[in-house]
C-alpha cells in the first residue's frame, strides 16, 4: 500500500504540470516547440556529417535492445510511426543504428554523468554528431548527489550545444525502492530542458502514465517472471526497462504498456523524427 501511495503521489505531481499529450511529444509544461528556434541556431554551427546521431548513456542505452531493433521489425506500428521510421531511415547515418555502441561512442553500463562530463570533449571530437540523445541518472541515484548531477548535466549539454550538436534530453525510468529519488532526478532533467531550450523525451512520466500502480517488475505480483521477461515496464530487477519476448519489436498500445524497451524505442524515434522535421533537415511531408 505504501508503494502504491508513493507512486500515486509522484504521478499526481507530474500530472499537475504536464498537459495531455502523446508519448512522443511529452515535454512537460513547456510551450509548444519552445526549443525549435534555439536548436536551429545551434544547428547553424554544425560542421559535421548529416544524419549522425549519438546516444550518450548507460546500460539502458548501450544495449542492443535500444534503438537497433527498429531497423529490423516494427510489428503493429501505427501509421505515424511508420512514417517517422521511413523519414529517419532515409536520413540517419547507417552506422548509428547499430555500430555506435560502446564506451568510445558515449554509452556503457554502470556509468554516471560524471563519466559523461569527463569524456564529452573526446566524444564530440571523435563523433561530431549532428544530434545527441542524452540519458544518465539511473546509476547516479546511489552515487551522485542531485545538485552535482544537475550541475554536471548542464555542463555536458552546454558542451554539445557549443560544438553545434543538437541535444535531446531524456528523463530516467522510475526505480524500485528509489521512486521518489528517480522522480527528483527526472525533474532536474525537465528543468534543464526548459532552461537550456532543448527537446525532451519524458520516459519517466510516460511510464507512470501508462502503469501508475504496477510499473515495477520487482513487485511480488510479478514473482513468476524472470529477468527482462516481465509484462510491465520495468524488468524484474526494478532498474532496467523490461523486454518480454512476446512484446519485443511490437508497437501496439498493449506492447507500449508492457515492454519498456518498445516504449523507449517508440518515444525516441518519434522525437528524433520531430527534431528532423522542425529543424527543416528533411523535406516536409504532404
Please describe what each predicted stretch is.
Residues 139, 157-187:
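Active-site segments of SGNH/GDSL-like serine hydrolases
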Residues 31, 35-38, 116, 120, ...:
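Stable alpha-helical elements in mature extracytoplasmic
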Residues 1-4:
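Positively charged n-region of N-terminal signal peptides that target proteins for export
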Residues 49-52, 127-133, 161-168, 196-199:
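Loop/turn elements at helix/coil->beta-strand transitions in domains of secreted/extracellular proteins
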Residues 176-286:
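Catalytic His-Asp segment of secreted/periplasmic serine-dependent ester chemistry enzymes
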Residues 7-16:
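Bacterial N-terminal signal peptides
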Residues 21-47:
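Short coil-to-helix leader/linker segments, especially the first N-terminal amphipathic alpha-helix
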Residues 28, 45-150, 223, 249:
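Conserved SGNH/GDSL esterase-like catalytic core that processes O-acyl groups on lipids
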Amino acid at each position: 500500500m505504501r508503494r502504491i501511495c508513493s507512486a500515486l503521489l509522484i504521478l499526481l505531481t507530474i500530472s499537475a504540470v504536464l498537459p495531455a499529450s502523446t508519448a512522443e511529444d511529452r515535454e512537460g509544461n513547456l510551450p509548444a516547440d519552445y526549443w525549435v528556434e534555439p536548436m536551429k541556431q545551434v544547428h547553424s554551427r554544425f560542421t559535421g556529417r548529416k544524419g549522425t546521431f549519438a546516444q550518450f548513456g548507460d546500460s539502458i542505452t548501450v544495449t542492443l535492445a535500444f534503438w537497433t531493433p527498429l531497423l529490423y521489425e516494427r510489428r503493429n506500428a501505427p501509421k505515424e510511426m511508420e512514417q517517422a521510421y521511413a523519414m529517419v531511415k532515409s536520413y540517419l547515418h547507417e552506422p548509428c543504428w547499430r555500430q555506435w555502441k560502446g564506451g568510445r561512442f558515449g554509452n556503457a553500463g554502470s556509468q554516471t554523468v560524471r563519466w559523461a562530463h569527463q569524456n564529452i570533449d573526446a566524444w564530440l571530437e571523435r563523433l561530431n554528431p549532428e544530434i545527441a540523445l542524452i540519458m544518465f541518472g539511473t546509476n547516479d541515484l546511489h552515487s551522485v548527489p542531485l545538485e552535482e548531477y544537475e550541475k554536471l548535466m548542464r555542463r555536458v549539454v552546454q558542451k554539445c550545444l557549443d560544438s553545434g550538436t543538437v541535444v535531446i534530453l531524456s528523463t530516467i525510468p522510475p526505480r524500485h525502492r528509489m521512486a521518489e529519488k528517480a522522480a527528483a532526478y527526472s525533474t532536474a532533467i525537465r528543468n534543464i530542458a526548459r532552461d537550456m531550450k532543448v527537446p525532451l523525451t519524458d520516459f519517466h512520466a510516460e511510464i507512470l502514465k501508462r502503469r501508475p500502480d504496477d510499473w515495477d517488475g520487482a513487485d511480488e505480483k510479478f514473482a513468476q517472471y524472470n529477468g527482462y521477461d516481465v509484462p510491465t515496464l520495468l524488468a524484474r530487477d526494478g532498474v532496467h526497462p523490461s523486454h518480454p519476448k512476446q512484446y519485443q519489436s511490437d508497437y501496439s498500445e498493449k506492447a507500449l504498456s508492457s515492454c519498456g524497451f518498445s516504449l523507449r524505442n517508440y518515444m525516441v524515434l518519434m522525437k528524433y523524427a520531430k527534431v528532423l522535421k522542425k529543424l527543416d533537415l528533411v523535406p516536409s511531408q504532404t
